[in-house]
Amino acid sequence: MHHMTLAEIARGLADKKFSSEELTKTLLARIAEHDPKVNSFISLTEELALSQAKAADARRANGEQGALLGAPIAHKDLFCTQGIRTSCGSKMLDNFKAPYDATVVSKLAAAGAVTLGKTNMDEFAMGSANESSYYGAVKNPWNLDHVPGGSSGGSAAAVAARFLPAATATDTGGSIRQPAAFTNLTGLKPTYGRVSRWGMIAYASSLDQGGPLARTAEDCAILLQGMAGFDKQDSTSIDEPVPDYSASLNTSIKGLRIGVPKEYFSAGLDPRIAELVHNSVKTLEGLGAVIKEISLPNNQHAIPAYYVIAPAEASSNLSRFDGVRFGYRCENPKDLTDLYKRSRGEGFGAEVQRRIMVGAYALSAGYYDAYYLKAQKIRRLIKNDFMAAFEEVDVILGPTTPNPAWKIGAKTGDPIAEYLEDLYTITANLAGLPGLSMPAGFVDGLPVGVQLLAPYFQEGRLLNVAHQYQLNTDWHTRTPTGF
């Protein structure tokens, strides 16, 4: 049962081939057996999962249907879950049990999804490798010596290892799409405001967005259907009707205009990945898509702009974790200053501390105009580039990452090298656009992803293109050895 996709599970449950309780027990046993070598979970919720599975089976017995009813999932450990530890991968929140459910959690629970647990992540979602977690690094199921990507590495590794068919994740600068690329999954970052951020512990509030990680575009459509929608509790949520994402999957892409930015194929891109991207372009062209070279001239400025804006917002968001209001409190402080200093120094890891300091510096008097304001101006230019491009094309295609997954520890001493891995993903966050990564091949046995970007609220278009691609390729069906 563990090899089934979310769509296959939905059909199996509807046809009464197995029960949600049977499936849940099977997957929990599989996690117990195999996760010690992957480290994809921070917390397992066996008791909750079994009670939700029994309830889902009872709802089906009463005639209720639904693609998520009885389907097992997991939540990235920054979505608040009532009475269950929500750690953000940090010592700072190691003993925090949320008093309420995040909107994403409550919506999926109402749809009948079964929560198997909370997945590992980079501390406070800051990282591209899932090495900064207080609970240890996550291993890539395709090669346990390599990273799974971050910050949603736990969700990605759990799905890739066939512990469950799909999981929630978040994306601030590529944290859904990059792990999807590194673990041979399909991952979708929705339009900013499409999925509620209420109860989702913030890293950078103007960039964060929740979304699905799964093996196929079809599964992403199912999970996104349960996550998306307006939420009056989230001031950044946008009141836009949610379409039926599964309904448009089988639409022909003949005549669809796909733009390929020339700036994406620079010296920093692994030539083997470039070849796989070109192969995917040929596949889509063979399906009737029209390919056009485009330009995104300000793409080169994206990384410095992002690594001013995101840390600036993080330094503000994380100021509440001080040992007094929220979070870990040090023992036997000498005075109030010592309490603040030691609680934050001991509670936050090195990467979080680095980004807080960078952000505080960028917002400080004398540097605000030179750094933060200039970064926001670049953000506007990047958005303008996309708006101009979407006058000419319907979808933009390029590599998800410049390199395949690296070995664990290879970049820990060089944060800039890790930041540069976000080159192709962060622009979608800066502009608020939807983006999707889909499997496109392998380099040295490690998965490679291709990224698709679309105009605002065109998630259905991305899922349609990805589904048509997956009907004509088999990369997404490959399974890591040993899983």
Curated annotation (Swiss-Prot):
Top EC category: ligase
Record-level GO BP terms: translation
InterPro entries, A to Z: Amidase, Amidase_CS, Amidase_dom, AS_sf, GatA
GO cellular component labels: glutamyl-tRNA(Gln) amidotransferase complex
Active site per UniProt: K76, S151, S175
EC number: 6.3.5.7
Entry annotated with the keyword Nucleotide-binding: yes
Catalytic reaction equation(s): L-glutamyl-tRNA(Gln) + L-glutamine + ATP + H2O = L-glutaminyl-tRNA(Gln) + L-glutamate + ADP + phosphate + H(+)
Record bears the keyword Zinc-finger: no
GO MF annotation list: ATP binding; glutaminyl-tRNA synthase (glutamine-hydrolyzing) activity
Pfam families recorded: Amidase
Keywords, alphabetical: ATP-binding, Ligase, Nucleotide-binding, Protein biosynthesis
Family indicated by similarity: Belongs to the amidase family. GatA subfamily.
Complex formation: Heterotrimer of A, B and C subunits.
Record's function text: Allows the formation of correctly charged Gln-tRNA(Gln) through the transamidation of misacylated Glu-tRNA(Gln) in organisms which lack glutaminyl-tRNA synthetase. The reaction takes place in the presence of glutamine and ATP through an activated gamma-phospho-Glu-tRNA(Gln).
Protein name: Glutamyl-tRNA(Gln) amidotransferase subunit A
Organism: Pseudomonas fluorescens (strain SBW25)
